[in-house]
Every structure is written in structure tokens, then in C-alpha cells.
Amino acid sequence: MTNYHERIRMLRKESHYNQTQLATFLNIAQTTYSDYEKGKVRMPIELLILLARHYNVDMNYICGISDTKNPFPCI
């Protein structure tokens, strides 16, 4: 099972974003985002949800529970 911090790093790189761009999107400092990717600090669930929506992947995927990229559910 992949940790969420590894998964958000992988998704960022696949999407050709840098940490500063995602930090701006999430309205946080780049250093904070870097700490999330390194697993130094836990990312709040609200930010994980925003990233899952942004990348259009479900929470099971972004949290590393599943390796299947299902789309983010539309409600």
C-alpha cells in the first residue's frame, strides 16, 4: 500500500506541477506542501479532498488504499 504523501507527489509529477503551484492552489506555503509530500506533517483531510477533486481521483486512490484510479465521485 502506498502512503498518501507518496501518492500526492506522484500525482503532482505526473501532472507536471511544481510544489509552488499546488501550494498556491491550496492556499498554503510551499514549505508546508513540501512537508506534506515528505510525510513530515499530516495533510488535513480537507486538502486531500481538494487534491482528489483536482486530479479527478477518488479518496481511496489518493490515500493509497487502492491502486485503481477511479474518478472523484460527482454529487
Question: Where in this protein do the model-derived segments appear?
Answer:
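Short, charged recognition helix plus adjacent turn
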Residues: 53, 63-75
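Recognition helix of helix-turn-helix/homeodomain-like DNA-binding domains
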Residues: 27-42
